[in-house]
């Protein structure tokens, strides 16, 4: 009897977790009105704000020059690019300084002299040097649309936002079985889930294509130099003091990135993020949120990586217990509820992959759908391993920054992109894809 009660309780908890996650993931597609509201409004041509674009780069000499060139093609007239390099990284420094020599009015190079380096320390090093009304953050491998700053400027002006979070999208879904799922995760997160968080007043910001009014950022003290998820931490702190955050996603305007080039790199990246979420949870800034539902959402979101690890281990164990041990028929049937939710999630992911390919002009073949389904259980094992590793590192007091290397896979010819020059923005997007082909 007790065993049956335990099995039913665990199964119902797993089922509720799966349903909540799926419902939030589908937020943007609930109604046509919600979907339309997630995009940028078309700018009117006025330039209201100036931008300081921070570009931290460490051992990124292979991709940094391309990113700077793309930023310099921006249609906005009032911005500066601040590249932050390490004092012990001469190769990346040389690339940054060459770019500054070519355009000294736009590009400046700041040197981070911290002995132990990480991204938030680099960003804080540059913050006192920012001259713009708004600080924007990009990563060294980012492929940024020339019209993005104009759209962000318009969003700040028309909404009165303190923060604007733009979209980020991994593109090289064809590179490996795990890159396919990684790309789809980003698609659901930035296309849908973050909009729900902004609507509810609690948002863990993304690591780049995030824009914050300079005075707001300085009032907040910049980034936490000891946090492995400095972006999430900043979003939690700003949400806790009631700052207005606007999220906008447009497939033409997204910043394009690549997935980690190896499975080990992905594991380390997820470990860092999970450990950072755990750090943010333990800091308890989220407890200052005014609403009870906001605090519940914050608690659940920050604990999600570890709930994933729990579910990845417990679901097969729970089914095995129900089938092999003496459990009532009713309890055995309940154990399959999480599996039903998983099947529904798979169907939604298949539809999402089709939409992803359609929006970005990428050819999604039948084999990609097979990889999506077959790779699901293995990807969950990877996420569970990263969560367990994050807990182990946090308990051991290890918080060194494990750098994710980039090779520019999103800049290579995928032979899967077609042009869609239906309007000015689509034409620019087609040119951006042609540049990636070259």
Q: Where in the sequence are the language-model features?
A:
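N-terminal membrane-anchoring/stem segments of glycan-assembly enzymes
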Residues: 1-45, 346-355, 383, 389-394, ...
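N-terminal signal-anchor transmembrane helix
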Residues: 22-78
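Membrane-embedded multi-pass helical conduit in multi-pass membrane proteins
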Residues: 34-43, 301-396
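Cell-envelope/extracellular polymer assembly enzymes that use nucleotide-activated donors
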Residues: 49-52, 80, 218, 233
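Acidic donor-binding segment of Leloir-type glycosyltransferases
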Residues: 69-111
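Long helical/loop segments within the catalytic core of UDP-sugar-dependent glycosyltransferases
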Residues: 100-104, 109-133, 146-228, 267, ...
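Catalytic donor-sugar/metal-binding loop of nucleotide-sugar-dependent glycosyltransferases
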Residues: 235-255
């Amino acid at each position: 009897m007790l065993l049956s009660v335990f099995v039913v309780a665990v199964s119902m908890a797993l089922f509720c977790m799966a349903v909540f996650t799926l419902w939030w993931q589908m937020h943007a597609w609930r109604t046509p009105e919600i979907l339309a509201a997630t995009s940028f409004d078309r700018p009117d041509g006025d330039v209201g704000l100036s931008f300081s674009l921070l570009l931290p780069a460490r051992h990124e000499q292979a991709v940094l020059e391309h990113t700077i060139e793309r930023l310099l093609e921006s249609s906005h007239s009032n911005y500066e690019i601040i590249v932050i390099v390490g004092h012990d990284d001469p190769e990346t420094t040389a690339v940054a300084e060459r770019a500054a020599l070519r355009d000294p009015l736009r590009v400046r190079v700041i040197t981070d002299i911290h002995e132990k380096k990480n991204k938030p320390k680099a960003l804080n090093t540059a913050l006192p040097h920012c001259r713009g009304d708004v600080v924007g953050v990009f990563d060294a491998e980012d492929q940024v649309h020339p019209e993005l700053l104009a759209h962000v400027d318009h969003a700040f002006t028309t909404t009165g936002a303190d923060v604007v979070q733009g979209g980020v999208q991994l593109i090289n879904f064809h590179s490996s079985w795990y890159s396919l799922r990684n790309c789809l995760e980003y698609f659901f997160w930035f296309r849908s889930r973050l909009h729900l968080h902004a609507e509810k007043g609690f948002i863990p910001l993304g690591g780049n294509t995030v824009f914050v009014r300079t005075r707001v950022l300085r009032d907040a003290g910049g980034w936490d130099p000891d946090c492995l998820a400095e972006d999430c931490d900043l979003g939690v702190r700003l949400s806790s003091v009631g700052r207005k955050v606007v999220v906008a996603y447009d497939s033409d305007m997204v910043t394009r990135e690549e997935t980690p080039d190896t499975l080990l790199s992905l594991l380390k990246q997820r470990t860092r993020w999970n450990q950072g979420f755990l750090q943010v949870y333990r800091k308890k800034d989220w407890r200052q949120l005014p609403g009870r539902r906001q605090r519940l959402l914050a608690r659940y979101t920050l604990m999600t990586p570890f709930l994933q690890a729990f579910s990845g281990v417990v679901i097969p164990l729970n089914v095995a217990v129900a089938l092999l041990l003496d459990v009532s028929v009713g309890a055995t049937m309940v154990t399959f509820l999480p599996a039903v939710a998983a099947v529904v999630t798979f169907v939604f992911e298949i539809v999402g992959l089709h939409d992803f390919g359609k929006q970005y002009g990428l050819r999604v073949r039948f084999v990609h759908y097979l990889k999506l389904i077959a790779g699901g259980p293995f990807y969950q094992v990877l996420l569970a391993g990263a969560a367990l590793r994050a807990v182990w590192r946090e308990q051991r007091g290890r918080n060194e920054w494990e750098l994710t290397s980039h090779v520019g896979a999103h800049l290579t010819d995928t032979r899967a992109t077609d042009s869609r020059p239906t309007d000015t923005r689509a034409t620019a997007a087609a040119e951006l894809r042609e540049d990636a082909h070259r």
